[in-house]
Amino acid sequence: IGLVISANGQNIRAAYSFYYKTDVSQEKYRTQSDMMLDWSIGCSVYYNDASFHRDSLSNIAFDKNGNISDSEAYQKIFDYRSGAINDVTFIDFSEKKFETVYRPATIFLEGKGILELPRWQITDETTVTSMGFAVRKATAEYLGRKWVIWYCEDIPVSAGPWLLWGAPGLIAHAYDSEEIFHFKLLNVQELGTDSRYAQIKDFCESPQGVSVHRYTYEMSKAEQVHNKMMRDLDYMFSMAGESPSQVTVVDKNGRSSVMSNTRNYIPLIPDGYWK
């Protein structure tokens, strides 16, 4: 693939597409094609690139009272797509800890947990991905699902998207046994500068000009709260300090209808894992 990364600690940024379903009966996947992993020795952060740029510009565009203080930065916010995943996952490998920040609406829901090492069973199967990465297959039961990964031994970085890690190389493709989720590596590059870890961490801790409702729990509790919010919009509104409200949508023919306050959602860590 024309990229050589040494094991002595260069920073890298890997771009992934994330495919997921909200209902197991669905045939088509929803896609987030701009997920990023920034890795450096001791830590990593997994985030969405569009959300990162919108957050960075928001910090410039607004003052501490939420008023627009930089019109140029404010206009640039709209150059990046809305609807991108706002969730962020931080891993501290040296402390064996992780933190996920879920950010629906004006809510910052932080879940903290102990990082488990997946017991990867390495196989003899190898292949070359469509992007030209030579990879080897491994499997493990991890966080309530059976995961299959293909990792790249030529990139000696024991990391991957989300909370997937611990293989003897960067994870290039990962999916669960039900194929509800897929992560696919698009490209990887060495960084001449530091990762975005500190910048994203600072924003999550003190966003400029944004009034947020912050909740911090152990991961099991945070997942329960998050999953309920994703399935019940009335509950999400209440967590954001708002009264439940009806949302009206208009179709292409001009017909309006009230959007359901409930929706399907499948979490990466299944509900039953925490029971």
Give the label of every model feature segment.
Residues 122-185:
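Glycine- and acidic-residue-rich phosphate-binding/metal-coordinating active-site segment common to enzymes
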Residues 1-4:
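Bacterial N-terminal signal peptides
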Residues 8-120, 125-127, 134, 148, ...:
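Extracellular or lumenal secretory-pathway regions
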